[in-house]
Amino acid sequence: CISARYPCSNSKDCCSGNCGTFWTCFIRKDPCSKECLAP
């Protein structure tokens, strides 16, 4: 999986980068969805 850190406050907008708390966004190969977890 490819992981990247984005500033966000919850898993819903993890990859949008609009919030202050850093989460880790994992882009899963299958089913090609984004799963966001706390660091």
UniProtKB/Swiss-Prot annotation:
It is found in: Secreted. GO terms for cellular component: extracellular region. Disulfide bonds join C1-C15, C8-C19, C14-C36, C25-C32. Its main location: secreted. InterPro entries: Spider_insecticidal_peptide. Keywords: Disulfide bond, Knottin, Secreted, Toxin. One of its GO terms (molecular function) is toxin activity. Expressed by the venom gland. The presence of a 'disulfide through disulfide knot' structurally defines this protein as a knottin. Belongs to the neurotoxin 13 (insecticidal toxin ABC) family. 02 (Calisoga) subfamily. Causes paralysis to insect larvae (H.virescens). This toxin is active only on insects. This is U1-nemetoxin-Csp1b.
